[in-house]
């Protein structure tokens, strides 16, 4: 069984011009699933009905208390989010699906995609488990990625990523996450 420590190398190896080990029909199944997930995400963004925010989600758990209160109690709706920002969010979903597709084709075990979890009554959807390790997929600019690469996210986490994945880890009763 593959280990998450080799995930990046194994994904790069898919594109090295060496034949991959997975049968082409199996690859097609994974690609079909990927296509279906893209369809779900794209349609959700194109046909989403205007609604107001009004509930706390685990994805917001690391934000400052005051910002959380405002987000939950304001009358702001999804209509207030610019089209360019909505496309940026969609791009993140597409990249997440691509990462999980590549992980699967590279022979890693991908499970529990978008599994709903609850911590202290607050719901959320984790991204996935890869090789039995909780994984939260993040897309970032090269500037923002420095925090991950230089391992300084613990000191500077403006989006609350650590709190978010910690909540998912608590819901799954696991100690290891990536």
Predicted ranges, named:
Residues 1-134, 141-152:
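Metal-dependent nuclease catalytic cores that hydrolyze phosphodiester bonds in DNA/RNA
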Residues 97-106, 154-178:
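Metal-dependent nuclease catalytic cores in nucleic-acid-processing enzymes
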Residues 135-139, 176-178:
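A structural motif
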């Amino acid at each position: 069984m593959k280990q998450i420590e080799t995930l990046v190398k194994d994904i790069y190896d898919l594109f090295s011009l060496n034949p991959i080990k997975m049968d082409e029909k199996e690859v097609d199944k994974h690609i079909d699933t990927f296509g279906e997930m893209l369809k779900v995400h794209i349609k959700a963004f194109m046909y989403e009905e205007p609604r107001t925010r009004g509930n706390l989600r685990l994805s917001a758990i690391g934000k400052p208390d005051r910002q959380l209160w405002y987000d939950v109690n304001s009358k702001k709706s999804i209509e207030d989010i610019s089209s360019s920002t909505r496309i940026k969010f969609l791009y993140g979903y597409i990249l997440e699906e691509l990462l999980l597709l590549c992980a699967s084709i590279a022979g890693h075990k991908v499970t529990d995609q978008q599994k709903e979890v609850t911590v202290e009554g607050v719901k959320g959807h984790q991204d996935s488990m890869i090789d039995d390790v909780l994984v939260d997929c993040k897309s970032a600019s090269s500037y923002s990625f420095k925090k991950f690469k230089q391992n300084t996210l613990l000191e500077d986490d403006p989006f609350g990523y650590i709190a978010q994945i910690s909540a998912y880890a608590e819901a799954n009763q696991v100690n290891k996450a990536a």
